[in-house]
Amino acid sequence: MRALAAVLVLAGCAALPGEEVGGLFEVYRDTDVPIVSKALFEPERYLGTWYEVARYPVPFEAGCVGVTAEYAAIDAETISVKNTCRNPDGSERSVIDGTAEIVGPGRLEVSFPSVPFGAADYWVLWTDEGYRTAVVGAPNGRSGWILNRDPEIPEDRLKAAREVLDFNGYDLDRLMMVRQ
């Protein structure tokens, strides 16, 4: 999702009214707090479609609603990534395709050929037991998301996901819910 940044920044996306944008290099977590990826991460269970239900404000997703990420296996260590951003009226704004290399338990490096910034750290910090909800972050604290298999997230899983972000040093006051 981070690499969606370049496409949307270059396209000059505008924020929705009242939406905080954040800077490209804004940090949303205390980087002195250790960040922990999911040790028992099962990539095959992570595959499929995820809905972005919450995120930290970043320019590359300014104005995006109904954001989805689709993951499919390429081989044992590589996952295809397709991120879709929609306009508030539901029309498709942008789609970006890339790959994620598994570099450790719950740790991926995501790259998009059309983006000149190189690979980005994408750490799965937590999933619920059924892989219905996931928390994703980055050691540099410049991004973070709560993903869910359905557009609506149950309150108990949202609460658990927020606790994971807090545990990993993220500022919960800056987390914004995403309209589906």
Model-predicted segments: where are they?
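Sec-dependent N-terminal signal peptides
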Residues: 3-11
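A beta-rich soluble binding module of mature secreted/lumenal proteins
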Residues: 13-180
